[in-house]
Amino acid sequence: ACVQIFRFNNFTTSDDYQNDYGLSTTHWVTTFAKDVKPRTHPYQVVCPLPLNIPKYLKRYSYTNIRALRANLGTTKFIPVEYFEELLTLIPNPSTGISLLFWIWKETGSLDHDRVKGFTFFDKSQKHHYFDEHKACMHKGDLEKALYLKMINGDTTEILQP
């Protein structure tokens, strides 16, 4: 079986973190935010925001346009219809839940044992593994509820918001 490992934005795969999540990476997940450092390794680049659609590029004004343009031809973007469906469920989805929703829509399932590193913005957890507790604009409770429905295969309320 092919193992796909998605890492977000300014991830690190240093030996310090090897026991937590290993060193491999197959996909770089980025929204091309201004504070995201460019990568030179030839990862498959995926963007869980539809930044290839002008109205969404305008909505996410923090986008580094130069980096986006440099990667436009090689980046796979979330299909806009998936993102718009997600917006009916979660008004301001994180890139993490956007990616998981995208995978779920494409495959029809989501395996909890293969998803690592999501805290759903639990206030007792760090926002990211590398920083301090931060205020968050995302709705962790809604994201967690959607995640649980996806891993449990419960599509009744997901498909009928």
Kindly label every feature range from the protein language model.
Residues 1-161:
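Metal-ion/cofactor- or nucleotide/acyl-coenzyme-handling active-site neighborhoods
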